[in-house]
Amino acid sequence: MADVSDAVDVGGAQPKKRTFRKFSYRGVDLDQLLDMGTDELVKLFHARARRRFQRGLKRKPMALIKKLRKAKRDAPPGEKPEPVRTHLRNMIIVPEMIGSIIGVYNGKTFNQVEIKPEMIGHYLAEFSISYKPVKHGRPGIGATHSSRFIPLK
C-alpha cells in the first residue's frame, strides 16, 4: 500500500515538460529560412512557385511586402502588427511575412489571416475562401420528374 502512494507522490511532484515540435520547411529550420537569400529560398519551393519567383516580383507584390515591413516596424514590441489589406490572392507566402496579419479580399470582404510558419510556399488565396460552401437541403420544385407529385408546402 505504501509503495503505491509513494509512486503517486513522485509522479505528482515533477510536472511533465511539454516539448514542441520545431518547425522546418523541407528540412530547413525557421531561423535558417529567415536568414536565407531569395535564390536559396526559391530552390526549396515547388515548381510553380519557383517559376513565379524566377520571373520576378512585379510592382504590386513588392508594394505588399513593403507595407508588411512597415506595419511590423511600426508595431510596438510584443504586439501584433496592424492588418494590411490586399487583393493579391496569388501572392506566395515567404518567411519574411511570418507574424504579419493580412486582410485577403475574397470578392466581398477582407478575411484577416495571421501568417504562420506552416503557410510558407502557399498562396494567400488558400486561406481566404471566395465562395460559400453548399449546404444541401431538400430538392426544389422541378429538380426531378417525381417532384411534380410533391405538394407545394
Curated annotation (Swiss-Prot):
What's the name of the protein?
Small ribosomal subunit protein uS19
GO BP annotations of the record are: ribosomal small subunit assembly; translation
Keywords of this entry: Ribonucleoprotein, Ribosomal protein
**Stored InterPro entries:** Ribosomal_uS19, Ribosomal_uS19_CS, Ribosomal_uS19_euk/arc, Ribosomal_uS19_SF
**Highest taxon in the source lineage:** Eukaryota
Q: Does the keyword Ribonucleoprotein apply?
A: yes
Q: Which family does it belong to?
A: Belongs to the universal ribosomal protein uS19 family.
- PROSITE patterns documented for this protein: RIBOSOMAL_S19 (PS00323)
**Which organism does this record belong to?**
Elaeis oleifera (American oil palm)
The cross-references to Pfam families, in alphabetical order and at most eight, read: Ribosomal_S19
Single GO MF descriptor: structural constituent of ribosome
GO terms for CC? cytosolic small ribosomal subunit
